[in-house]
Regions:
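Positively charged n-region of N-terminal signal peptides that target proteins for export
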Residues: 1-4
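Active-site neighborhoods and metal-handling regions in enzymes and metal-associated proteins
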Residues: 23-454
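Sec/Tat signal peptide C-region and signal peptidase I cleavage site
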Residues: 18-20
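Bacterial N-terminal signal peptides
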Residues: 6-16
């Protein structure tokens, strides 16, 4: 009996300690507490899904309260209507819903109204779900949603109604033909005549970020870099045995084990002396390895391209020619960011950076893209792999503060140690344009090879 009582006391004590630990963790990461958030050392752990949601939900509310009305005023839209159906959501939907929701529930009609006068935008969910209290709910049955919408539009009587349809911006083209038809029918001719594309409002909403989100993104990037560092090490790679596909699938599995999301399949390619670009198969001493890798964490996507060198017996560093190629890639990064300034367009930055790079003797290709809620996110691209003369429409959009971008590019460089073989050095790092216009790497950039022992 005494043993049973003692065991019971131990169990109760452990349960209490566990509950206390969970409570402490929840408090530590709650942005609603008004306290600064300390992110965990990514070498020890990542945030649990519960901890992530405790951060993301208040950010969504703050974005609505501090950003949306100004964006609606800038784009001249009084009311923004975003219908989504389960498994056929608008691309904007995920940025407006908590991590506890993986899809729209049945049909959800989100409505945003700008009251003017510097007041926050009003927000409504027409249907049966308030999305964890983010939205005041205009309750209605499935068959009555459009009738409830019409009553709300009559009440607010907006001059301009925005919907997400666009030829140029995939992020702002979420309304289906059926949903638009039903919307127009419900609004009636007078209100339907007020409809215009909300494409630039959708782009503006998706591209601008809060300072708190940037802090979180830096943590996410550290986690992504850590996975790459681990993959490009002898923990994963045994030269002469491990294949590039082995590394690819190790990275994919590692993402799952960490509880992270993914938005594209990782890649690991090989550059080797005397062979055509990107041979596949067993990794050997003397190979240069390249990876393209990204994760989804706290609702944010990352995108990174790094390079490693497999040492030959007796080597302690990569050949000078390979290091010079990496340095040339760093120079192209500098030039790209130098010419991508606030209120300049992506096409202007592309033309100027390419011109200066060629003057300096580089063989460049630039194809940067915004990043954030999507991997290839809303905002101005700087070229594309097949658009080195400029990107139509989207490339004429300007850079704005508090936005994030993947600086993605490559240079082709001659490597003397490889018999003057031309080698492509591809790099990609995520960076933010700060409020004053200065660029800031999210978590530094690669300027030296990962070294793998033979």
């Amino acid at each position: 009996m005494r043993i049973r009582i003692a065991l019971l006391l131990v169990v109760v004590s452990l349960a209490a300690a566990t509950a206390k630990a969970i409570a402490l963790r929840t408090s530590e990461y709650s942005s609603e507490s008004g306290q600064s958030i300390t992110y965990p050392d990514p070498t020890q752990r990542v945030l649990t899904h519960r901890e992530q949601n405790a951060l993301v939900t208040p950010w969504i509310k703050k974005r609505f309260d501090t950003l949306l009305a100004g964006l609606m005023t800038r784009e001249g839209i009084d009311m923004w209507i975003i219908p989504s159906r389960e498994y056929n959501e608008d691309p904007v939907f995920a940025s407006m819903s908590p991590l506890t929701y993986f899809a729209s529930r049945r049909r959800t009609i989100l409505v945003f109204s700008n009251p003017g006068g510097g007041k926050p935008a009003e927000r409504y969910s027409i249907g049966r779900f308030d999305y964890d209290g983010i939205y005041p709910m205009v309750a209605s049955t499935n068959d009555g949603q459009h009738e409830a919408l019409r009553k709300l539009v009559d009440e607010k009587n907006p001059k301009v109604i925005g919907i997400n349809e666009s030829d140029a911006w995939q992020h702002a083209d979420g309304i289906t033909a059926n949903e638009k038809r039903r919307l127009v029918e419900a609004l009636g001719p007078a209100h339907a005549a007020k409809i215009k594309s909300a494409e630039m409002l959708a782009v503006g909403w998706l591209e601008v970020k809060l300072p708190e989100e940037l802090d979180a993104y830096r943590h996410a990037m550290k986690v992504a870099h850590l996975v790459i560092r681990e993959a490009f090490s002898n923990k994963v790679i045994t030269p002469g045995t491990t294949t590039n596909e082995d590394v690819v699938w190790w990275m994919r599995q590692r993402v799952v084990e960490l509880g992270l999301g993914k938005w594209f399949q990782p890649s690991v390619t090989i550059w080797r002396q005397g062979e055509k670009a990107n041979p596949r198969g067993v990794i050997l001493p003397g190979d240069m390895l390249h990876t393209d890798f990204g994760i989804v964490y706290m609702g944010f996507s990352t995108d990174t391209q790094h390079n490693a060198y497999v040492l030959k017996p007796g080597e302690t560093d990569a050949p000078a020619g390979l290091k010079a190629g990496l340095k040339a890639g760093n120079r192209l990064q500098d030039l790209t960011m130098q010419y991508a300034r606030l209120e300049r367009t992506g096409n202007q930055a592309l033309a100027d950076a390419l011109a200066q790079a060629k003057k300096e003797g580089l063989v460049p290709s630039i194809y940067c893209h915004p990043i954030g809620y999507h991997g290839h996110a809303a905002g101005p691209p700087i070229g594309m792999t097949d658009y080195q003369q400029g990107v139509p429409v989207r490339g004429d959009y300007v850079f704005r503060p508090n936005t994030w971008h993947s600086i993605e590019l490559n240079v082709t460089h001659i490597v003397p140690e490889w018999g003057n073989q031309p080698v492509r050095f591809a790099l990609e790092e995520d960076a933010a344009i700060m409020p004053g216009g200065k660029w800031d790497w999210i978590d530094g950039r690669q300027d030296a090879f990962y070294l793998i022992k033979p």
